[in-house]
C-alpha cells in the first residue's frame, strides 16, 4: 500500500499507510499517536456555528468609486472627492434557510458590503427588497421561526408563516414582494441592495439629514418564475454563486450605481408615512402615487473584480453590522435598526468569538498608508423642532406595533402598480405563487388568509381564493 502523508497542526509531516502506524501492538494507536489525535480533534472542531440568518452566501472583492460631488450633504471621508476609490468586500446571501439550501428558493436576499475606509470599516447591510416584514424588533425571532421548518417534523409548514402574517398585518407589504418574482431573483449580479433603514448624515456644524442609500444593479433585474426557480434549484443549488464567480473569471465585472435619498428632519413629520417605519419604502416615484417622491441622488459606483481564494477565511468569517459606522454617519431612531446595532455584534461573538474583529477578514485598514490627520470635532447636533420630537416619539408608543392604514395602503398600491411597472404576467405570477403556498394549509387558515388579503384589495383576495381552491380540488 502506498505511503500517505498527513500534516499535523504544527505543520510537521507524518508518514504511514492510512495515517495510522502502530509501534507497539499492545497499545492502541490513540495512545501512540498524538498527531492522529490532533488531526481528529481539528476535524471535530473545524466548523463554526452558521449564521442565525443569512447562512447561505457567496462573496467577492471590489471597490467603491465616488462619481458625483455630495459634499453639501455629508462629511464622510469615503464620499468626499470625485474619483476617490475605497476597497471593499461584498457578501450575498439568502436569508432564512440553512447554509446548504438552494440559492434559488423563494427568499429575501442579502447584500452586505464592508468598506475599508481610512476612518475605519463602514458596513452597509442591505436587502434586495427596500423594506422589511416588521417594525417591532421583539417580533423578529417569531418571524424567523415561522419561516423555518416545523420543529416537530423538521418539514416546511406554510401554516406557520401564514399564521404569523395574518396576525401581523404590517408584514403585508413585504409579503407581496416576497411572493412576486422579486422573491426568486435568479442571480446575485442582477440584484439591487437597499439599506431599508433611515440613517443620519451629520455635518461639521451639527446640522444633519435623514438618508437612505441603495445600490441599483447595472446588470438590470433578472427574475425567474416560481417554477423556473424550483427547476434551477433542483439542477444546481449553487447557481447564483457559480454565476458570480464565472462572470469574474470571464472578466465581466458586475457593478452597481449607488444612490442616496435625503429627507430634512423638519420635513419628516410632514410626510404621509413615517420614514422610521422600515415596513415602508421611500418612494422613488413608482408608488404610491399620492405620496411624496424622494428622489435618489447618485453617489458613485461599486464594482466587483476578484473572487476569494479561501472562502472560509475571507467570506465565512466576515462579520457585518449596521453599528460599524464612520465619522459623519449615525443611526436613526428606527427601532429595528436600534435592535440590530446590538444583535449583529452579539451574534458574531457567539459565531466567531469575542475577538472576531481581529480576524483578517474584519481587520480595519485605516492608517495603512501612514498617519492620518485628526478630524476636527463636530459641533453638537442641532436640536430639531418640537414637532420633530413629537414625531420621533411615535416609535416609542404602544401603538407602534399596531396596524395602521398605511400597512394596507402600500401593498394595495404595489398590487395596483404591478401591471404598469412589470406587466400583467408579473402580477399574475404573484397570485400563482401565493396560491401554491396557501393551498398547503388547512381550510380555516385559508379563509383567514383570504380575509387578510381582502384588506389589501378584493380582487387580490378573490384571485388567490379561486386559484388556491382549484389546486386543492
UniProtKB/Swiss-Prot annotation:
The active site is at residue 54. It is an enzyme of class 1 (oxidoreductase). Residues 1-15 have a biased composition (Low complexity). Keywords: Alkaloid metabolism, Heme, Hydrogen peroxide, Iron, Metal-binding, Oxidoreductase, Peroxidase. InterPro entries: Catalase, Catalase_AS, Catalase_clade1/3, Catalase_core, Catalase_haem_BS, Catalase_sf. One of its GO terms (cellular component) is peroxisome. Pathway: Alkaloid biosynthesis; ergot alkaloid biosynthesis. Heme binds at residue 344. One of its GO terms (molecular function) is metal ion binding. This is Catalase easC. It comes from Claviceps purpurea.
Amino acid at each position: 500500500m502506498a505511503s500517505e502523508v498527513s500534516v499535523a497542526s504544527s505543520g510537521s509531516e507524518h508518514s504511514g499507510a492510512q495515517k495510522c502506524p502502530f509501534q507497539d501492538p499492545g497499545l492502541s494507536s490513540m495512545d501512540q499517536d498524538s498527531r492522529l489525535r490532533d488531526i481528529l480533534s481539528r476535524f471535530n472542531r473545524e466548523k463554526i456555528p452558521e449564521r442565525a440568518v443569512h447562512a447561505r452566501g457567496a462573496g467577492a472583492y471590489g471597490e467603491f468609486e465616488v462619481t458625483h460631488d455630495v459634499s453639501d450633504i455629508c462629511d464622510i471621508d469615503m464620499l468626499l472627492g470625485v474619483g476617490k476609490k475605497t476597497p471593499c468586500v461584498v457578501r450575498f446571501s439568502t436569508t432564512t434557510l440553512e447554509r446548504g439550501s438552494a440559492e434559488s428558493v423563494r427568499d429575501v436576499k442579502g447584500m452586505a458590503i464592508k468598506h475599508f475606509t481610512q476612518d475605519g470599516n463602514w458596513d452597509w447591510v442591505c436587502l434586495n427588497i427596500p423594506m422589511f416584514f416588521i417594525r417591532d424588533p421583539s417580533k423578529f425571532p417569531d418571524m424567523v421561526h415561522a419561516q423555518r421548518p416545523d420543529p416537530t417534523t423538521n418539514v416546511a409548514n406554510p401554516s406557520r408563516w401564514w399564521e404569523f402574517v395574518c396576525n401581523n398585518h404590517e408584514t403585508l407589504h413585504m409579503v407581496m414582494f416576497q411572493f412576486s418574482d422579486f422573491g426568486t431573483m435568479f442571480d446575485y449580479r442582477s440584484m439591487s441592495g437597499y439599506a431599508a433603514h433611515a440613517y443620519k448624515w451629520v455635518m461639521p456644524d451639527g446640522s444633519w439629514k435623514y438618508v437612505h442609500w441603495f445600490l441599483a444593479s447595472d446588470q438590470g433585474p433578472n427574475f425567474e418564475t416560481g417554477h423556473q426557480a424550483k427547476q434551477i434549484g433542483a439542477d444546481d443549488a449553487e447557481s447564483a454563486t457559480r454565476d458570480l464567480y464565472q462572470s469574474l473569471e470571464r472578466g465581466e465585472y458586475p457593478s452597481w450605481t449607488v444612490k442616496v435619498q435625503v429627507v430634512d428632519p423638519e420635513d419628516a413629520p410632514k410626510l404621509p408615512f413615517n420614514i422610521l417605519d422600515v415596513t415602508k419604502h421611500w418612494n422613488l416615484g413608482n408608488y404610491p402615487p399620492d405620496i411624496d417622491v424622494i428622489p435618489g441622488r447618485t453617489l458613485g459606483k461599486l464594482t466587483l473584480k476578484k473572487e476569494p481564494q479561501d472562502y472560509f477565511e475571507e467570506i465565512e468569517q466576515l462579520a457585518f453590522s449596521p453599528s460599524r459606522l464612520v465619522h459623519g454617519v449615525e443611526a436613526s431612531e428606527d427601532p429595528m435598526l436600534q435592535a440590530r446595532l446590538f444583535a449583529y455584534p452579539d451574534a458574531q461573538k457567539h459565531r466567531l468569538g469575542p475577538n472576531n474583529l481581529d480576524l483578517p477578514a474584519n481587520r480595519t485598514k485605516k492608517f495603512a498608508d501612514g498617519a492620518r490627520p485628526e478630524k476636527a470635532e463636530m459641533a453638537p447636533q442641532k436640536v430639531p423642532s418640537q414637532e420633530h420630537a413629537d414625531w420621533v416619539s411615535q416609535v416609542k408608543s404602544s401603538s407602534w406595533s399596531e396596524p395602521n392604514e398605511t400597512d394596507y395602503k402600500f401593498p394595495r398600491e404595489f398590487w395596483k402598480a404591478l401591471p404598469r411597472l412589470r406587466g400583467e404576467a408579473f402580477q399574475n405570477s404573484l397570485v400563482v405563487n401565493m396560491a401554491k403556498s396557501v393551498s398547503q394549509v388547512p381550510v380555516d387558515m385559508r379563509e383567514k388568509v383570504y380575509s387578510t388579503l381582502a384588506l389589501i384589495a378584493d380582487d387580490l383576495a378573490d384571485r388567490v381564493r379561486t386559484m388556491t381552491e382549484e389546486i386543492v380540488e
